[in-house]
């Protein structure tokens, strides 16, 4: 098992995000120093943590004495000197480039040479934040999602000078800390916010143009995307000014399409939440609302992949975990069809003189977008096959078994590969066959599909067992059912 090499974490900032990040590390058994310039703000941050821990006691996630023990490991300080024994320091102050830089200049004076420094920024390039640091190789971005103690997604963003060792060390540890990290390129918006913020903004444009009311747009969006809350309700939850400022930051880098709508700006100026019951504003046009919100999602997700920010599977993973969407952008595209998806994007992007992303051009004529649930890595003469469904505990479904078979046969037939290792990403090796798959097939009365899936699995296991090349399962987490067979 991986060993935790971080024992004391510093969190700079005690607001909503800072206190939640501190809570996350407290719940994982670490000592935490929370630093802020104002002791009253620090006390409020600690009180907020106490409220959430009390809720965890009520839900029987932890016990009362466990809550007290956690709070006993939380230290409040208005001095950067208190960070001197920390092995990891995360900044979570408000989004101001110079303020954040000054925070790290001060922190670097006190921390040891091996301490990892990280920013929770959602807006600024990591390489820009790193400029004043004397050792930028130990600095990177770790972007949490609300609520940081509960939401499992963390985007890890290495800057230009971040060392591979720093990135890999934190990536490994976030799995140990019960998070699901994805490594993304250092661009504004990173991966998830790059398409999520324009999705929110487009909803306000649809309202502005009279295609629906707040209530009707929210309702239709919930139905189409399968969400618990629509874009206006989500902005109320996370803060409408955040959506506006994030839109402005994106527009500064990527162009006018990303600019906040006039309606969004006015709402921020009013200092009021959206009226979620409001049915005023034009006539409902469900087709326009659906097509444009999907087009924003599909188009920008395709830009992300075209630019090498991350791959389609990790983009979908980010949407499912970070935003709690049932399906990610590319899974949605596969569901409604690539041809229709492409037409939606072309229609929207042409209004803004934006080119069709290269990824969508290259996907033309294909039936589906290939989503890699199983990755293959070559390390010298060793082939490593990694199952990448951490949000599903790497449970086996039809696509996973098919891709496992393909990757195994590739290595089996490659004379340069002398041995093959199987491993699972996250906290499980393989938690058996997908229960969801069986329930869906039973509901569809498709027992033949279940039989075919079982046969595919047994064929794969037989090939592995009879392979003349040494095979090994690297167990770093649970293995159940089909995972034990594998």
PLM feature spans:
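Redox-cofactor binding/interface segments in oxidoreductases and associated redox assembly factors
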Residues: 91, 119, 423, 430, ...
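Residues forming the Rossmann-fold NAD(P)(H) cofactor-binding site
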Residues: 19, 398, 484
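N-terminal glycine-rich phosphate-binding loop for ADP-containing cofactors
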Residues: 1-380, 388-391, 441, 445
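Conserved CoA-thioester-binding segment of acyl-CoA-metabolizing enzymes
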Residues: 365-425, 439, 448, 455, ...
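Active-site-proximal alpha-helical scaffold in enzymes
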Residues: 204, 484-486
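An acidic, glycine-rich surface segment that forms the CoA-thioester-binding/catalytic face
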Residues: 68, 435-476
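Glycine-rich phosphate-binding loop at the start of an alpha helix
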Residues: 18-19, 136, 432, 451-454, ...
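Short, active-site-adjacent cap segments at secondary-structure transitions
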Residues: 83, 124-125, 427-431, 480-481
